[in-house]
Design a protein with these regions (language model features):
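Short acidic-glycine-tyrosine-enriched beta hairpin
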Residues: 74-89
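A short hydrophobic beta-strand segment most commonly corresponding to one strand
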Residues: 38-41, 86, 101-116
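Conserved short histidine dyad/triad with adjacent acidic residue
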Residues: 23-24, 39-54
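Short beta-strand His + acidic residue motifs that chelate non-heme Fe in jelly-roll/DSBH
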Residues: 50-52, 70-71, 87, 93-99
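Short, charged/polar surface micro-motifs in flexible loops or helix N-caps
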Residues: 30-34, 44-48, 67-69, 111-115
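Glycine- and acidic-residue-biased ligand/ion/polar-headgroup-sensing regions
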Residues: 56-58, 62-68
Length: 142
């Protein structure tokens, strides 16, 4: 546990997937905050992830840049910079980048936990802090 008040991107490992990159800037291990986790998600153009749920965590997505399509339960909406999406625990959802530039999101889980599930997926590759999130920089532990 830490009590860090300021975190920079180079301080944090990256989770690399074929659809994009995640950097969890606030987790219990990084900042010591126990009630939520938060990070930046970058989805590459035309990429997205399959519908999934977080059985024990609510999720908030805030669109920083880009445009995409967000599914929540049986509703699908176009999203763009400035939009916010609330996904209650256990509700199936998915995100797709429909634009030509990366879709940049700020994601929050409350309580924390789904970020650890993502890290443990076989398709998740870990890039150490301070390294560009590219396949060449993946660590052996992935």
């Amino acid at each position: 546990m830490s009590d860090r008040h300021f975190v920079e991107p180079d301080d944090i490992e990256s989770q690399l997937f074929d659809w994009g990159v995640l950097k969890w800037m606030s987790t219990p291990e990084v900042t010591g905050g126990e009630r939520f986790s938060a990070g930046v998600v970058k989805l590459e153009p035309g990429k997205g992830h399959e519908r999934h749920t977080h059985p024990e965590s609510d999720e908030i997505l805030f669109v920083i840049r880009g445009e995409g399509e967000q599914e929540v339960a049986d509703e699908t909406r176009d999203i763009t910079a400035g939009d916010m999406v609330f996904i209650p625990e256990g509700v199936e959802h998915g995100t797709l980048n429909t634009g030509w530039e990366p879709l940049l999101l700020f994601a929050v889980y409350a309580p924390p936990g789904p970020e650890d599930v993502l890290r443990d997926l076989p398709e998740c590759e870990i890039v150490p802090p301070g390294k560009l999130p590219t396949p060449e920089n993946v660590t052996e532990e992935s």
